[in-house]
UniProtKB/Swiss-Prot annotation:
NCBIfam families: mraY. This is Phospho-N-acetylmuramoyl-pentapeptide-transferase. It is a multi-pass membrane protein. PANTHER family: PHOSPHO-N-ACETYLMURAMOYL-PENTAPEPTIDE-TRANSFERASE, PHOSPHO-N-ACETYLMURAMOYL-PENTAPEPTIDE-TRANSFERASE HOMOLOG. Keywords: Cell cycle, Cell division, Cell inner membrane, Cell membrane, Cell shape, Cell wall biogenesis/degradation, Magnesium, Membrane, Metal-binding, Peptidoglycan synthesis, Transferase, Transmembrane, Transmembrane helix. It comes from Alkalilimnicola ehrlichii (strain ATCC BAA-1101 / DSM 17681 / MLHE-1). Its cofactor is Mg(2+). It catalyses: UDP-N-acetyl-alpha-D-muramoyl-L-alanyl-gamma-D-glutamyl-meso-2,6-diaminopimeloyl-D-alanyl-D-alanine + di-trans,octa-cis-undecaprenyl phosphate = di-trans,octa-cis-undecaprenyl diphospho-N-acetyl-alpha-D-muramoyl-L-alanyl-D-glutamyl-meso-2,6-diaminopimeloyl-D-alanyl-D-alanine + UMP. Pathway: Cell wall biogenesis; peptidoglycan biosynthesis. Belongs to the glycosyltransferase 4 family. MraY subfamily. It comes from the Bacteria. The chain crosses the membrane at residues 26-46, 70-90, 97-117, 132-152, 168-188, 199-219, 236-256, 263-283, 288-308, 338-358.
Amino acid sequence: MLYHLAMALEGVYSGFNVFQYLTFRTILGVLTALGIALLVGPAVIQRLVEHQIGQQVRDDGPQSHLSKAGTPTMGGALILVAIAVATLLWSDLTNRYVWVVLLTTLAFGVIGGVDDYRKLALGNSKGLSARAKFFWQTVVALMAAVFLFSTAQSPLETSLIVPLFKDVVLPLGLLFIPLVWLVVVGSSNAVNLTDGLDGLAILPSVLVAGGLAVFAYATGHAVFADYLGIPFVAGAGEVVVFCGALIGAGLGFLWFNTYPAQVFMGDVGALALGAALGILAVVVRQELVLLIMGGVFVVETLSVMLQVASYKLTGRRIFRMAPLHHHFELKGWPEPRVIVRFWIITVVLVLVGLAMLKVR
């Protein structure tokens, strides 16, 4: 909104030209979302406490988690508001990628919000049924996929890019649609599974968003894309502002979510953040790189899948408890140690992913 106002006033005062620069607007997006989260956060937490919107804790989990019962949850709504406001203020709202990324994120937030509400209303940790949750996730993801497929302006926008190999592009055709579904739904649920410790999911989400922001900037810049040997996708660079908003909102939320957490994001935040990372990777055509940068989310998900498969096939469990972070807790690792080590791993994986920009 303010971007369009500044462009309209460009002829009145030349200083408004600065708003045409993507980097400047991204910085504003970071600061705006961060400011909203930090300023509004205490009031949101207080309101959640007053309405007794507290976390329900499983009694079969680590005993140390029982003390978390009653901690305010659904704080992810704060993240979504901060992201939405910052994105709407500083993005080019005529850009289709901005809208598909923002609306997909918010839609998954609504799904997560309904899930959180049912948990609170029913007084247990079950929430929305897995079938219902999966159905609505599929509906939203397919809508985004069909939109991107139908508005694609070149075959590159619906092709799979293989990292490390220059000019290796696999045209997908209609297979692009199920790929988008898999990436968005998979990423959403992976982040949700990871969100089991204080700050464990939010900082890796911020770090991966930062990595994808670099890819988005390069992908949307014809000169950089040509130099780096990656596909040029016109308009994709504009989602960097959204990435900045996510980073700012995430850091602001981490201020209150760091151990010991004053508030949890709930499914309203976790499902939305995962979907955001997934749809961002699709827009910049780096779905395979997302697997690397989001390796912590991938491993957490695989630990659950392996645990379930092993128990059903052999009656034995591979891990003491899944997802993987609970396994380390039950081994005696203090919660902060698990969290920080997962953060460190994510930093390394994001750097590896960024290195693939040049290694071709």
